[in-house]
Structures are given as structure tokens and as C-alpha cells.
């Protein structure tokens, strides 16, 4: 396992929860002796929706909504068996999407 890297990509709608989850992962990996690169903030995806306010007329009267998706990237450079075991047992907050890849 020493030759491989672990790339963790986190997504969430709330940046405070995302930063907290990123910190928990980083602390867990550091405690097991692994090296960490990051957290690297990736570009925020902003989806905008425009809807009519009224049900019938008034096309000029509209309301705009947006959903922001925040993303972070963590690289664990020298993982060992204890690092992988600790990451599997880690319980993160709800609302954080985690993608793990071996690179």
C-alpha cells in the first residue's frame, strides 16, 4: 500500500459542514502517520433557477434561486493499513458526499 495514494473528494451544500468533515479526515490520517496534501478547495458549482412568481400571468415577475455545491480535495500520500482502517471507521456528518479513489 505504500506505493499508492488515496485521493478523497468531498462535496456538500454547506461549506461549514464540509470544512469540519475535511478536518476530521485530515486529523485521522495524521494520527496514523500518513502525509497529507490539502485540503484543496475546488471551484464552487452554482446552479441558478428562475421561476415565475404567479401561477398565471406576469411573466416579468420572477424569482431566482441558486444551489451552491462546494468541493474539497484531499490527497493522502503515504497511507498504511492503520490509515485505511481508521478512515473506514470514521463517521462523518450527514450531507457530505465522499468519493475515494486509489491513485
UniProtKB/Swiss-Prot annotation:
GO cellular component: ribonucleoprotein complex; ribosome
Record has Ribosomal protein as a keyword: yes
Pfam families: Ribosomal_S10
S-S bonds: none
GO biological process: one example: translation
Keywords noted in UniProt: Ribonucleoprotein, Ribosomal protein
Single GO term (MF): tRNA binding
Family: Belongs to the universal ribosomal protein uS10 family.
Subunit structure: Part of the 30S ribosomal subunit.
Biological function: Involved in the binding of tRNA to the ribosomes.
Protein's name in the database: Small ribosomal subunit protein uS10
Biological classification of the source: Bacteria, Pseudomonadati, Pseudomonadota, Alphaproteobacteria, Sphingomonadales
Amino acid at each position: 500500500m505504500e506505493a499508492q495514494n488515496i485521493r478523497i473528494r468531498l462535496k456538500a451544500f454547506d461549506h461549514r459542514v464540509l470544512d469540519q468533515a475535511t478536518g476530521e479526515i485530515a486529523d485521522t490520517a495524521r494520527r496514523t502517520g500518513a502525509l497529507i496534501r490539502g485540503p484543496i478547495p475546488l471551484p464552487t458549482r452554482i446552479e441558478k433557477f428562475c421561476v415565475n412568481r404567479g401561477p398565471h400571468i406576469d411573466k416579468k415577475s420572477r424569482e431566482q434561486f441558486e444551489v451552491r455545491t462546494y468541493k474539497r480535495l484531499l490527497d493522502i500520500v503515504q497511507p498504511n493499513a492503520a490509515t485505511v482502517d481508521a478512515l473506514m471507521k470514521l463517521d462523518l456528518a450527514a450531507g457530505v458526499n465522499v468519493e475515494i479513489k486509489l491513485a
